[in-house]
Amino acid sequence: MNPWTLKFAKAKPLANGKPGIDIAIPSFGYKSSVSICRTFGFIRKCKVTDAARFDERMLRDVVTNDNTASDVWADTAYRSQANEAWLKRQSRVSRIHRKKPRGTPMPERTAKANVAKSKVRARVEHVFAGQKDQMGLFIRTIGIKRAEAKITLANLAYNMHRLIFHERRAAMG
């Protein structure tokens, strides 16, 4: 698969009122999809791919059979009919965000359900924020294997950080 991806930038209108020119910027990047322990925040499994890969294809790679919880929490990028059917066959309960219907406002019930799901799903975002802010993780490698090694080491360091946090917390009572 091609690791290059395009990032689209919407141009602002020009001063004379004419529309600006939209641009597409090619960029080289990687994605890290993780599953975490909801109780303690440890990273259970990680899959690194190039940035051009669709998120919905990653769900099967990060959902593990050794996880005793039946709920699967994810954002809308992971929702597809194939993933929903797969989760049902795996006896899992989908807690994946719902997308807004095209051309209509999101129903209030769906919006409230997404807000409730976000409270749990935000734990995953803490993993990425911790890696970016505390560890200064920025991938500047060429080759998926090097990027995977760097991200795996960052995940290991994050898990050690979480372990120390829980050990100190338990020691304090």
Residue ranges and their predicted role:
Residues 1-86:
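Polybasic low-complexity intrinsically disordered regions
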Residues 48, 98-102:
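Short, acidic/turn-prone active-site loops that include or flank metal/cofactor-
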Residues 57, 82, 103-110:
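Short, charged, surface-exposed secondary-structure boundary motifs
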Residues 63, 88-90, 173:
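Short, solvent-exposed amphipathic alpha-helical segments in soluble enzyme
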Residues 70-73, 95-96, 165-166:
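Acidic/polar loop patches that form or flank catalytic/metal-binding clefts of enzymes
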Residues 76, 98-99, 126:
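Short secondary-structure boundary segments
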Residues 90-98:
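Short hydrophobic/aromatic-enriched beta-strand-loop microsegments
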Residues 112-173:
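Basic, amphipathic alpha-helical segments enriched in Lys/Arg and hydrophobic/aromatic residues
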